[in-house]
Amino acid sequence: MGRAPCCEKIGLKRGRWTAEEDEILTKYIQTNGEGSWRSLPKKAGLLRCGKSCRLRWINYLRRDLKRGNITSDEEEIIVKLHSLLGNRWSLIATHLPGRTDNEIKNYWNSHLSRKIYAFTAVSGDGHNLLVNDVVLKKSCSSSSGAKNNNKTKKKKKGRTSRSSMKKHKQMVTASQCFSQPKELESDFSEGGQNGNFEGESLGPYEWLDGELERLLSSCVWECTSEEAVIGVNDEKVCESGDNSSCCVNLFEEEQGSETKIGHVGITEVDHDMTVEREREGSFLSSNSNENNDKDWWVGLCNSSEVGFGVDEELLDWEFQGNVTCQSDDLWDLSDIGEITLE
């Protein structure tokens, strides 16, 4: 279903109107009036559709039509009425004498709507829109457009090339790399202040050396020997007893060589081991004299069954006859009694 066609299209002319057709239509309407647009073409002797005759008369041939461009005042009225009425172009045309609804609609779609959208996109406020701003923008754009036409055409902005993107990326990464050492220096300077370096800004390696020396001065090593351990540095001397502690840390380089950490040194390991061996041998020999088993104990101390670990602080003995004797500390003469064999 739908509206019936005004007339049959077969044998009718289409396209632009000629001056003769405009003259025939104008004379007929002036003498007979508009009347019915369906029967008007046949009565006037035109091979045109009734709709085509109506649009030609209303939009072009009327005497009360305004010719020329739409003024700024008319633009203001159109914007205000459109905000109130919407797309009701016929009602808007009644407030603009000499302008047709078709002309107003075409002007809105082609000019005003685009300018209003651009203005609201820049300002970000669509409610407080002033028509004067739109009109001023139109005048400014027309003047600037005339100036730009006289100048040479500018290069069109397209997508950025990959080479420029790579250069930008390299510049960004380089700036980040330069900023990182500054942050590290600030961190080390703060760490030096927390470590009682009196606010001196030290490098990373100097800061680590200072921390190592501070840790060496605070660490504790339990000495198990009864003799005094005297360092190479004369300022640091530690005398120890049975369960005394010394402020030193051991890192042995080779067996029988002197070990060094910073400025602290200790006596040779071989010397300590020989002293302990002689002391233990004398102790065992004294006990063997009491039990009349001197030969067996002396042979035990001098035999290869006694194992000395160079890297260990404890001495392990494995005796024959399933008798084992281990000591975590040095032997106390008061606690040792007679040893009985199975």
UniProtKB/Swiss-Prot annotation:
MF-aspect GO terms: DNA binding; DNA-binding transcription factor activity
Residue ranges: DNA binding: 37-61, 89-112
Domain HTH myb-type, chain residue ranges per copy: 9-61, 62-116
UniProt cross-references to InterPro entries, sorted A to Z: Homeodomain-like_sf, Myb_dom, Myb_TF_plants, SANT/Myb
A GO cellular-component term linked to this record: nucleus
Biotechnology annotation for this entry: Promotes flavonoid biosynthesis in a light-dependent manner when expressed in tobacco (Nicotiana tabacum) through up-regulation of the biosynthetic genes.
Function: Flavonol-specific transcription activator involved in the regulation of several genes of flavonoid biosynthesis. Activates the expression of CHS, CHI, F3H and FLS1. Controls flavonol biosynthesis primarily in cotyledons and leaves. Confers tolerance to UV-B.
Protein name: Transcription factor MYB111
Native species: Arabidopsis thaliana (Mouse-ear cress)
Upper classification of the organism: Eukaryota, Viridiplantae, Streptophyta, Embryophyta, Tracheophyta
Gene: MYB111
